[in-house]
Amino acid sequence: MSAKQPNRKPAGKRKESDASAQEGRERKRAAKRKGLKAGSRQQVEQAGKKSGTKQAKDPRIGSRKPVALIVEEKSSKPVAPKQIKEKKLVMTPEQELASIENDDRLNDLLDRLDAGETLEATEQAWVDQRVDRYQELMDELGIIDTDDDEDEADFDEADFDEPGQPASEEELWDRFTQVDYQPEPKPEPKKK
């Protein structure tokens, strides 16, 4: 049969000390009562009145800084408005050329020059600058200025076919074979 097990203490209630019993009772009372005591709002105000040395706390929330109802003008330095940097508009050469051609001031000054008037130094410098820029743009865009009379004298309409009549294939072939085509010589690569 089985061996006899050692005697165990009976599994009864454990004895409590007086202190732990008292703590248990307090916890039980606190658990029964939930929330604040009745009339706690009024009791808080009364507690504030009892301490007469302290100033009564204002229950309102917010700033206690006084607000000026009348606007007073300050006699300080006027603030200079910030200078906004104007971005230069980047224009294409075609747009810039068109703006120079349509410039009323430039056209008026050029008309005065053509009439034989003399311009002030600043106006003359400005006109020269704009005309130079106009020439630069014309060269950059590859536009030939048709206002020159010398170029028109060299132009002979008889040398060109009328645009309405296409050349025959034989004429085109003759023109092609008569052209002396000599390709440009290629530079020799440098030897190291």
Curated annotation (Swiss-Prot):
It comes from the Bacteria. Interacts with Der. It comes from Aeromonas hydrophila subsp. hydrophila (strain ATCC 7966 / DSM 30187 / BCRC 13018 / CCUG 14551 / JCM 1027 / KCTC 2358 / NCIMB 9240 / NCTC 8049). Keywords: GTPase activation, Ribosome biogenesis. Transmembrane segments: none annotated. Belongs to the YihI family. Residues 1-87, 145-192 are annotated as: Disordered. This is Der GTPase-activating protein YihI. InterPro entries: YihI. A GTPase-activating protein (GAP) that modifies Der/EngA GTPase function. May play a role in ribosome biogenesis. Residues 13-26, 183-192 have a biased composition (Basic and acidic residues). GO terms for biological process: ribosome biogenesis. Residues 145-172 have a biased composition (Acidic residues). Pfam families: YihI (PF04220). One of its GO terms (molecular function) is GTPase activator activity. NCBIfam families: PRK05244.1-1 (NF003560). Residues 1-12, 27-36 have a biased composition (Basic residues). The keyword S-adenosyl-L-methionine does not apply. The lineage of its organism: Bacteria, Pseudomonadati, Pseudomonadota, Gammaproteobacteria, Aeromonadales.
